Amino acid sequence: TTVDDPEAKLSGFANPKMAEWIDGAIDADLEETGCEETTAKYREGDRKVVTDGGTYLRPTIVYCESFEHPLSNREFLCPYASVVEVPQAEMLNQMGESLVVTAITKDEEFQADLLASPLIERLNLGPISTMKISWDQPHEGNMFEFLYKRRSIGMAA
């Protein structure tokens, strides 16, 4: 897409310094061997874009050779994902805790392992968009409901 594409759906940063920090952090970690930004060759220009008074970060996908690379398990406030190849039998132990996991597999035993894992907050089995919101999910619905436990209290007068 282009900077002036009316169909683009990226949110700008309220604080441009945050976009600068994220962009710099990704670039700094890309200096370490064992990682490649696979989306760079498809972009026209830099990851960080300043236009029409807004600061934006374009989607970024990196391929890491191992989980030892600092970008292999990072989260940023922008469209970012890392890809690390690992044997399926080692995957749950290697990935650690995750807010969202999408598994595109027909292996029913592996699906059962994923369902049983306490490390995964939200599990998508199949090609489900992570942009699809389900308000009945704890981290997508009312945050008050998620953060605070309801309980009834009675007090003697």
Positions of PLM-derived features:
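Structured helix-beta-strand junction loops
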Residues: A28-T33, E97-S98
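Conserved beta-strand segments of alpha/beta enzyme cores
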Residues: G34-E36, S82
